[in-house]
UniProtKB/Swiss-Prot annotation:
InterPro entries: CinA, CinA-like_C, CinA_C, CinA_KH, Competence-induced_CinA, MoaB/Mog-like_dom_sf, MoaB/Mog_dom. Belongs to the CinA family. Pfam families: CinA, CinA_KH, MoCF_biosynth. It comes from the Bacteria. This is Putative competence-damage inducible protein.
Length: 412
């Protein structure tokens, strides 16, 4: 079955709030085999809402509305749908009692417009609002399913999980949707697509959806099957084919981000880490400490932005700074080795480069060197030539640092 999500509210059109409900609902609907092909946003205007309803009825089996169930005059969703379906609005006694009791408890006047929140479509299945006033509702009429939900996410999300999804399962084929995200780094989206283009072109079940995100590329594999284990087998087969071709760039699944994977591997190896940050100015250390329990492996870091700190704290030779420059392979080498020794860590990592927007030491913005020194191993320096804004260059440099750390840890 196909669904359309219609968000009602002028504040959405004005950009005053983001439509996070649509993202949540699309993901949840996909997981129970309901396709979402359209998101519509319409203001608080009954004529435009009516047109949106008519358009959605032409292309969707399920129409899901969020917003417009409140007590004010511009809350028009129920009234407009009632008129469209030629159904009366009636009071839901449970909702009316809930709202009435709230006003009694707070000592406020229970006005007629507040009673409006308890109105539901005649014959509808009513969804209790456990976190607010206005109930939701579901109606099956003329071969279409109409779902009305409150706009505030704190009300809508728990209502969907507790009441709406079980209701919608009555209209699905029973197919389960299983998804797995493969995460890649060090390869561009276009390069990766070329290597797996035939798999993408031939996709049916599972489907393959590539997505680039600031230096990373993900492939979302999605399979449908009434049996979850069979869906997993379908995905595993395609994953194996993909990793045969681009496995060297693969680092994790789903929400396993680079910094998490690198730190978890560091913990398993029982090794400690220190960082020297010039270009990144603490970004790397900040992401390290986002991981719980990291104090067992992270010794600390030095933000060595000024050359005096590079020379006098981290003992980069003056000759290197004068001859090769602070932005150089040689400087990154010394920074990584010496921060490791200074903080008595097993591994030292360093970042030096030009974030821009102007050149420095006659080197263009995006010129970056990441140093990696590991006790008992030869120190490596990875030169990078990055593009983007100042902040993007710094953030991408940090990601490359985690990537090279992760790959090196896999080897030892």
């Amino acid at each position: 079955m196909n669904a359309e999500i219609i968000a009602v509210g002028t504040e959405l059109l004005l950009g005053q709030i983001a439509n996070t409900n649509a993202q949540f609902l699309s993901e949840k609907l996909a997981s129970i085999g309901i396709n979402v092909y359209y998101h519509t946003v319409v203001g608080d205007n009954n004529k435009r809402l009516q047109k949106a309803i008519e358009a959605a009825e032409e292309r969707a089996d399920i129409l899901i509305f969020t917003g417009g169930l409140g007590p004010t005059k511009d809350d028009l969703t129920k009234e407009t749908i009632a008129a469209s379906l030629d159904e009366a609005l009636v009071y839901d006694e449970k909702a009316l009692a809930l709202i009435s009791n709230y006003f009694k408890r707070t000592g406020r006047e229970f006005t007629e417009n507040n009673k409006k929140q308890a109105l539901v479509l005649n014959g509808a299945t009513v969804f209790a609002n456990d976190h607010g006033m206005a109930p939701g509702m579901g109606v099956n009429k003329n071969g279409k399913v109409y779902i009305l939900l409150p706009g505030p996410p704190k009300e809508m999300k728990p209502m969907y999980v507790s009441y709406v999804e079980p209701f919608l399962r009555n209209f699905t084929t029973g197919e389960n949707i299983y998804s797995r995200v493969l995460r890649f780094f060090g390869i561009g989206e276009s390069q990766l697509e070329v290597k797996v283009q035939d798999l993408i072109d031939g996709q049916t079940n599972p489907t393959i959806a590539p997505l680039a995100n600031d230096g990373e590329v993900t492939l979302r594999l999605t399979a449908k099957h009434q049996n979850v284990s069979e869906a997993e087998k379908l995905i595993q087969h395609v994953e194996d084919l993909i990793l045969e071709r681009v496995g060297e760039f693969f680092y994790g699944y789903d929400q396993e981000f680079l910094h998490y994977k690198a730190i978890e591997l560091l913990k398993r190896k029982g090794l400690t880490l220190a960082c020297a940050e010039s270009l990144t100015g603490g970004l790397f250390g900040n992401q390290v400490t986002e991981n719980a329990g990291v104090s067992s492996v992270f010794k600390g870091g030095v933000i060595c932005y000024h050359n005096d700190v590079k020379q006098h704290v981290l003992r980069v030779p003056e000759e290197v700074l004068h001859t090769d420059g602070a932005v150089s392979k040689e400087c990154a080498h010394y920074l990584a080795e010496n921060v490791k020794d200074l903080l008595k860590a097993d591994i030292g990592i360093s970042f030096t480069g030009v974030a821009g927007p102007d050149a420095s030491e006659q080197k263009e913005p995006g010129t970056v060197f990441v140093g990696l020194a590991i006790k008992g191993e030869q120190t490596a320096v990875f030169p990078l030539n990055l593009s983007g804004s100042r902040q993007q260059i710094r953030e991408r440099s940090t990601k490359y640092g985690f990537y090279h750390l992760y790959k090196k840890l896999e080897e030892i």
